[in-house]
């Protein structure tokens, strides 16, 4: 009996050691400089005209549907940028959104076309006037005005592309 238990223990020990070696070898598979994919909750540095701010990116349909729901606050210079692969007329509502927001609508080249106010928990749709919108930026109500940002202000597209690439990284 003792000999049988010792053999089982020895086999389990060998299996554990081999698993540990294989796991250590797999950890070295990443290329130097590789960064993990950034998640939905990651804030990225952005710039609109000369104003620097931080934004989370909503890229996937579920992220766009969730947006800023259930948030009780936002950082003063923090918001959410919605990115669309195909420019479109953009529409938003404020279901389960607890804070008033402003939304800026942008074309594919990063040009701000308009800013609209959205009110907490208001189910009325707020839509862009144009059908060529590629990005929408939600910030605290009054942020655009406080920072003197009006159409045709421009997003810093290299910074935006870097953030989108970090989110889409496979």
PLM region spans:
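Bacterial N-terminal signal peptides that target proteins for export
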Residues: 4-17
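C-terminal motif of bacterial Sec signal peptides marking the signal peptidase cleavage site
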Residues: 26-28
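Compact, glycine-rich, soluble single-domain proteins
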Residues: 30-170
């Amino acid at each position: 009996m003792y000999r049988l238990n010792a053999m089982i223990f020895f086999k389990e020990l060998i299996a554990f050691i081999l698993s540990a070696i294989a796991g250590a070898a797999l950890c070295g598979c990443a290329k130097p400089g590789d960064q993990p994919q950034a998640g939905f909750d990651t804030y990225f540095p952005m710039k609109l005209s000369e104003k620097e701010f931080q934004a989370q990116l909503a890229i996937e349909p579920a992220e766009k549907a969730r947006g800023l729901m259930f948030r009780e606050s936002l950082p003063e210079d923090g918001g959410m940028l919605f990115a669309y692969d195909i420019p479109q007329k953009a529409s938003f509502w404020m279901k389960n959104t607890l804070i008033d927001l402003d939304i800026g609508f942008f074309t594919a080249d990063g040009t701000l076309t308009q800013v609209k106010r959205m009110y907490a928990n208001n189910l009325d749709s707020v839509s862009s006037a144009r059908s060529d919108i590629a990005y929408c930026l939600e910030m605290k109500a009054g942020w655009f005005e406080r920072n003197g940002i009006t159409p045709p202000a421009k997003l810093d597209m290299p910074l935006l592309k870097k953030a989108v690439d970090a989110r889409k990284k496979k």
